[in-house]
């Protein structure tokens, strides 16, 4: 789609933030292989999807700061929303990054502490946190239960995946200008509609078996060719994640 005017991007980002409570979604993706994402979490409001998330410890889920609620019903161990066989655990404590901005989406990362530990199994595993930041061009997979159509919404019952590649900050700034912060990460496929959308926020971007990103924001309607998805770059927050879990264990 080429380079957007900053004013238009600002409007689109505002629209994206207005729908952030529903998160981001997978556009032009495919049904994930069953059980291939045992770290995937659904944050529910009642029985309805609120955001995605990713298990990083038996007591802790990592998600986007804009997914903040007073309490959460956390579903683990199933690729289907509402699966009666899934683990469901209440969570009443969550810790946003202290530098999070609702206006700019900078530091869009949050830890949710489960009220009781998960039961680890082949269907429930913690994701591996990154030892380093992966370079542009790295192949990754993003997953979630967000809407598969935009602007009209169609929420799938099955976990959806999309294969994308990391994009350099230099290239991504051609689209998003100064809206792209230093701890934000872009991913997508050139000339493709493949992207995240409402309902996917906080979900994992996994590259080489490590967590590199959390779904944060993008343009609206979703799936605009050459408008990459924007993620929180987890490798730049590992110290904060470890210290926060230690402080509130």
UniProtKB/Swiss-Prot annotation:
Q: Name the chemical reaction catalysed here.
A: Cleavage of proteins with aromatic side chains in the P1 position
Modulation of this protein's activity: Inhibited by Zn2+ and Cu2+ at low micromolar concentrations. Inhibited by SERPINA12.
Q: Which GO terms fall under molecular function for this chain's record?
A: serine-type endopeptidase activity
A single Gene Ontology CC term: cornified envelope
Instruction: List every stretch annotated Serine protease.
Output: 26-246
Task: Give the record's GO biological process terms.
Answer: positive regulation of antibacterial peptide production; proteolysis
Annotated site (Major binding site for inhibitory zinc or copper): 105
| Main location group | secreted
Spell out the coiled coil positions from the record: none
From the Swiss-Prot or TrEMBL record, give the protein name: Kallikrein-7
Recite the lineage of the species.
Eukaryota, Metazoa, Chordata, Craniata, Vertebrata
